[in-house]
Every structure is written in C-alpha cells, then in structure tokens.
C-alpha cells in the first residue's frame, strides 16, 4: 500500500483516497537536542500531525497535504510531553500554495509556505535553515528527522524526534514502485536500497537535509515503511526557490514551475 505520510485520523478528514500516513523515522535514533533547530512541530488542536522547516524568522515550509484548520506551530520542541523554556508557539498568518497546482491532486506540487503571525527569535534550540543554493547530487548523504512512527507497520509515535542518514538516489529508482507519480513531478528519491531506514507516519512536511542544505520535504512513500527498493519521495525544494522568494518579497501572484 502506498500512502502520503500523514497521521491516519487526519487522512480520513482531509484526503479522499488511501495515502501514506505521517511516520516517525524508521531505523534512526533520538536526535541530539540541538540537531533539529529548524524543525517545526505542527499541531491540530492538541495533537501533533506534521512537521515543517523554519527558513527565516517569519516563514515555514511544509507539505501542502499538511494543511488543516486551526493548527499551531511549535518551535524549539524536543520532547512533546516536557516543554522547555526555549519553545515558541506561532499561528499561521497566511498560507500559500502553488496557484497552478492541480485542484484536488495531492500528488501535484506538494508544498505549502506559511507566514507566521509574529517572528520567532533564534535561540539555543531554534534557528532557520536557508533555502538550497544548488540542487543535490545523487549519492549525497541526507539527514531525515521527525516525530513520526518508529515502527514500519503499527503506528508508534515517539515523544522525541528521531534522526537517520539516508542516500539521495537516482529518480529512476522511485519510478517502478510509484507509477502513479507524474513523470514531470519535481521530486527527489531518497532512502536505503536494502531498506531499514525511512521516513514514516507522522514525518510528513519535515525536511530532507543533504550536505547541510534544505533539499526536500517529506511527501510520499510505501507502507510498511522502510521496505527494500521502495525509497521515500520528497518534494524538491530547489525547484521552488524562485516561487518561495517571490512570495516572501510580496509577489503573492507568483506561480510555481510546471
């Protein structure tokens, strides 16, 4: 089964077909408390359901399929149960989607840009991750992180984020397991060919960081997670750089690449 990586209860509410629910990082370890300073936890009411990436003091990038009503974003979070003094909570002031995104097609242009209702302050546990200066190269070592499921089948959500290293693979590797993805999709293929390391339910919207640069957004994958020859699929951030920068500059009519 193939599903977008979002929590199952939100899938029922938001999506009209079976998709992969958000997951924890499979095959990883607890992140160092200062290893995820740009990672944003997104909550609907009181429940965590997605992640995002802080790209400057006022803007967060996440997946379009993470959109929901009345959500909040928490920054500087490590343990979801034990708050720390550096945590900051923000509401979305504005949300932006690709205006040329195919309506009701969650596989098309899965990116959302969020303006916060007030700027955040950098701290020991909070710092933005800048947009990529160049696209990543196949073979790059990439870092994944999130509060998603740490077990591949049953949903086991950890209290703290897990991190793992995977490899950026050739796009051709992701075509056979995911023929439903458009051939023109602006995505990255990343994982471990033999399986065992992957993003999973609850990791949706979080970052793929390759050689220290924010290169991807957790988007799509197989269920169970971490299967051999079924890597994860990530929205390619570099292809949306111009759109993101245009929106931030005030050109809200900017369109995304086809």
UniProtKB/Swiss-Prot annotation:
Every Peptidase S1 domain range: 25-249
Q: Where in the cell is it found?
A: Secreted
Q: Name one Pfam family in it.
A: Trypsin
Tissues showing expression: Expressed by the venom gland.
Bridged cysteine pairs (disulfide): 31-163, 50-66, 98-256, 142-210, 174-189, 200-225
Q: Which residues form the active site?
A: 65 (charge relay system), 110 (charge relay system), 204 (charge relay system)
What residues are glycosylation sites in this protein? 44
The UniProt keywords, alphabetically, are: Disulfide bond, Glycoprotein, Hemostasis impairing toxin, Hydrolase, Protease, Secreted, Serine protease, Signal, Toxin, Zymogen
> Which EC numbers characterise this protein's activity in its record?
3.4.21.-
Q: What biological-process GO terms show up in the record?
A: proteolysis
Q: InterPro entries, from UniProt?
A: Peptidase_S1_PA, Peptidase_S1_PA_chymotrypsin, Peptidase_S1A, Trypsin_dom, TRYPSIN_HIS, TRYPSIN_SER
Residue ranges the record assigns to the propeptide: 19-24
Q: Which GO terms describe its cellular component?
A: extracellular region; secretory granule
Q: Record's superkingdom?
A: Eukaryota
- Return one GO MF term: toxin activity
* The keyword Secreted is assigned to this record: yes
Q: Which proteins does it associate with, and in what oligomeric form?
A: Monomer.
Function (record text): Snake venom serine protease that may act in the hemostasis system of the prey.
Q: Give the family this protein belongs to, as stated in its UniProt record.
A: Belongs to the peptidase S1 family. Snake venom subfamily.
Query: What is the official name of this protein in its record?
Result: Snake venom serine proteinase 8
**Which species does this protein come from?**
Crotalus adamanteus
């Amino acid at each position: 089964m193939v599903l977008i990586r979002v929590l199952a209860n939100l899938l029922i509410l938001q999506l009209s077909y079976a998709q992969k629910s958000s997951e924890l990082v499979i095959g990883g370890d607890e992140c160092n408390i200062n290893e995820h300073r740009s990672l944003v936890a997104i909550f609907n009411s009181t429940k965590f359901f997605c992640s995002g990436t802080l790209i400057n003091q006022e803007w967060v990038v996440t997946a379009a399929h993470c959109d929901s009503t009345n959500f909040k974003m928490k920054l500087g979070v490590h343990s979801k149960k034990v708050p720390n003094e550096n945590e900051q909570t923000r509401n979305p002031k504005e949300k932006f989607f690709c205006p040329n995104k195919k309506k009701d097609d969650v596989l098309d242009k899965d990116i959302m840009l969020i303006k916060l209702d007030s700027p955040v302050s950098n701290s020991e546990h909070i710092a933005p991750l800048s947009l990529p200066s160049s696209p990543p190269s196949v073979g790059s070592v990439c870092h994944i992180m999130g509060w998603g499921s740490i077990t591949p089948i049953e949903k086991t959500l950890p209290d703290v984020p897990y991190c793992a290293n995977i490899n950026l693979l050739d796009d051709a590797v992701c075509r056979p397991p995911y023929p439903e993805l458009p051939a023109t999709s602006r995505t990255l293929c990343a994982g471990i060919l033999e399986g065992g390391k992957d993003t999973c339910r609850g990791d949706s919207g979080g970052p793929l960081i390759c050689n220290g640069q924010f290169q991807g957004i957790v988007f799509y994958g197989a269920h169970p997670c971490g299967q051999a020859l079924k890597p994860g699929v990530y929205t390619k951030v570099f292809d949306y750089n111009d759109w993101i920068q245009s929106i931030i500059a005030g050109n809200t009519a900017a369109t995304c690449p086809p």
